């Protein structure tokens, strides 16, 4: 009887986590979109973000748990400068959408001090080719301020694929492209892989990172973003 109650409670908790993750897709999007309409404040560092649901922070318990919020808070503290984020990412976005839709929004900003990009897992999930992914990404890199840009390589794709075989290979090819255009790379794969088997790294859908998982993303982005913004 007690065991059945415990199992039932666990099921309820898992369902609640999954529902929260689904809800966060729309709630985080609306929040970021509202902030993206705000004028740039005086005496702030401006960080623009492009990408998919990981850039939105889907999976985190609150939006403040997103890696963008976590890493900009850290860098803001270390540099003693306020940071204003313009997050143009879209949940479910592939690299092509980042190039065609999000990039023009970035170029509409009157100024930007750093650009953060994380996109690619949806290309894999939707079975797009590596060549089309790299072509879209190259379009992005040709049109961003390269000395102000840091991109993520691809993470292992959830606890069902802790080795992240395809994401590793795609990430290696992306690194070659980043080297060609002389942009910084945040080592997401390297930071996530040791914890890829740990379900606590993932949110309620066991695919997107949790707040804890996003702290690992923030670890990967912290140094390159700091290096860009302290110039």
What are these regions (language model features)?
Residues 132-135, 139-142, 169-176:
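Alpha-helical scaffolding segments of alpha/beta enzyme cores, especially the outer helices
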Residues 46-48, 56-135:
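Conserved SGNH/GDSL esterase-like catalytic core that processes O-acyl groups on lipids
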Residues 116-122, 140-169, 190, 196:
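Active-site segments of SGNH/GDSL-like serine hydrolases
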Residues 160-231:
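Catalytic His-Asp segment of secreted/periplasmic serine-dependent ester chemistry enzymes
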Residues 1-49, 61, 76, 197, ...:
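N-terminal secretory targeting modules
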Residues 87-89, 153, 187-189:
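Residue-level recognition of beta-strand->loop/alpha-helix junctions
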Residues 84-86, 148, 182-184:
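Conserved beta-strand segments of alpha/beta enzyme cores
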Residues 30-43, 100-109, 138-143:
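Short amphipathic alpha-helices and their capping/turn segments at secondary-structure boundaries
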């Amino acid at each position: 009887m007690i065991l059945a109650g415990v199992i039932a409670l666990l099921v309820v908790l898992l369902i609640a986590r999954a529902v929260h993750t689904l809800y966060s897709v729309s709630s985080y999007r609306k929040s970021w979109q509202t902030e993206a309409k705000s004028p740039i404040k005086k005496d702030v560092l401006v960080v623009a973000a492009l990408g998919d649901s990981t850039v939105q922070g889907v999976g985190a318990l609150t939006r403040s748990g997103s890696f963008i919020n976590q890493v900009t808070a850290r860098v803001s503290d270390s540099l003693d400068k306020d940071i204003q984020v313009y997050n143009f990412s879209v949940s479910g976005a592939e690299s092509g959408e980042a190039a065609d839709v999000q990039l023009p929004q970035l170029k509409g900003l009157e100024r930007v001090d750093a650009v953060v990009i994380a996109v690619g897992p949806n290309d894999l999930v939707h079975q797009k080719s590596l060549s089309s992914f790299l072509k879209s990404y190259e379009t992005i890199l040709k049109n961003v301020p390269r000395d102000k840009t840091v991109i993520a390589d691809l993470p292992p794709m959830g606890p069902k694929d802790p080795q992240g075989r395809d994401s590793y290979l795609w990430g290696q090819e992306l690194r070659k492209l980043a080297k060609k255009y002389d942009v910084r790379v945040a080592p997401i794969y390297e930071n996530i892989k040791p914890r890829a088997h740990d379900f606590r790294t993932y949110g309620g859908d066991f695919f997107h990172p949790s707040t804890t998982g996003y702290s690992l993303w923030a670890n990967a982005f912290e140094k390159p973003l700091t290096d860009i913004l302290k110039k």
